[in-house]
């Protein structure tokens, strides 16, 4: 399901609605809070009053599968790790890179996206 969600934001399928919650989801397990910094389109960004993007859709799909409501908290990027560590948020999703320092304080999922940055010059 992750590839389908990501592909709806990147590539020739971009712009299509990638994920919609089923109407019959039992959300009796409560609410999970996702900490993010909604400034990294297409992973998480503002669309009106909503925070949307690849990470938001993956988080919603997980909550649907586990029976939780999803609450997304937008914050400064440097506040995400402390929010998870303190229990203010249940998890963080914000285009985060795995580092040894971060691995010492939180657990990471498997990688679901790889990015390559480049520098451009005049021809």
Feature locations, PLM:
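Short, small-residue-biased leader/transition segments that mark boundaries at the very start
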Residues: 1-5
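Sec-dependent signal peptide cleavage junction
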Residues: 6-13, 18
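Extracytoplasmic small-molecule ligand-binding "clamshell" domains
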Residues: 15-21, 25-95
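Ligand-binding "clamshell"
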Residues: 100-115
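A bilobed periplasmic-binding-protein/Venus flytrap-type ligand-binding module shared by bacterial periplasmic
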Residues: 118-123
């Amino acid at each position: 399901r992750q590839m389908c969600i990501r592909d709806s934001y990147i590539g020739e399928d971009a712009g299509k609605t990638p994920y919609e919650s089923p109407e019959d989801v039992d959300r009796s397990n409560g609410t999970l809070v996702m900490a993010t910094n909604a400034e990294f389109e297409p992973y998480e960004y503002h669309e009106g009053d909503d925070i949307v993007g690849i990470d938001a859709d993956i988080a919603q799909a997980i909550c649907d599968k586990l029976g939780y409501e999803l609450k997304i908290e937008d914050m400064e990027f440097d506040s995400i790790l402390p929010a998870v560590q303190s229990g203010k948020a249940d998890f963080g999703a914000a285009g985060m890179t795995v580092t040894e320092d971060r691995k010492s304080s939180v657990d990471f999922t498997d990688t679901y996206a790889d990015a390559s940055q480049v520098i451009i010059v005049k021809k």
